[in-house]
A protein has these predicted regions:
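A short, conserved alpha-helix within the catalytic core of class I
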Residues: 91-104
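Glycosyltransferases and closely related glycan-assembly transferases
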Residues: 34-37, 100, 114
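Conserved N-terminal segment of class I S-adenosyl-L-methionine
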Residues: 1-78
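Hydrophobic adenine-recognition pocket in adenosine-nucleotide-binding enzymes
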Residues: 87
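Conserved beta-strand signature within the Rossmann-like core of class I S-adenosyl-L-methionine
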Residues: 105-113
Length: 114
């Protein structure tokens, strides 16, 4: 696990013990950090097969899924926190995904590169 400063910055925004959905979770590093340091639980969503395998290797719950399909597989308010970090710019329907983020999570944290 790297000691990346951005992991801790995001972790400080996530309440301890939260149920987290990490959209476009990559290799699962952030979710693994939240589990280890904030007592969180939850799922990552990732499309890339190599990253899904890396999540599994980290013992991160991951669903291989195309986010352009939306989040219909989750009920309203299923998660305390939904993370969408550097993901939005890769999606075709950004407005819909922001609506879905608000629907399934009580708190949404969204970032994108400048």
């Amino acid at each position: 696990m790297s000691e990346r400063q951005d992991l801790q910055v995001i972790a400080n925004l996530v309440p301890e013990g939260s149920r987290v959905l990490d959209l476009g979770c990559g290799d699962g590093e952030l979710l693994a950090h939240l589990i280890a340091h904030r007592g969180c639980r939850g799922y990552g969503i990732e499309w890339d097969s190599t990253n899904v395998e890396r999540c599994v290797a980290r013992n991160v719950n991951v669903i291989q899924y195309n986010l352009d399909e939306g989040l219909a597989l989750f009920d309203d308010a299923s998660f305390d926190v939904v993370l969408q970090l550097d993901t939005l710019q890769h999606l075709r329907n950004t407005a819909h995904m922001l609506q879905e983020t608000a629907r399934v999570g009580r708190l949404g944290i969204v970032s994108f590169p400048n």
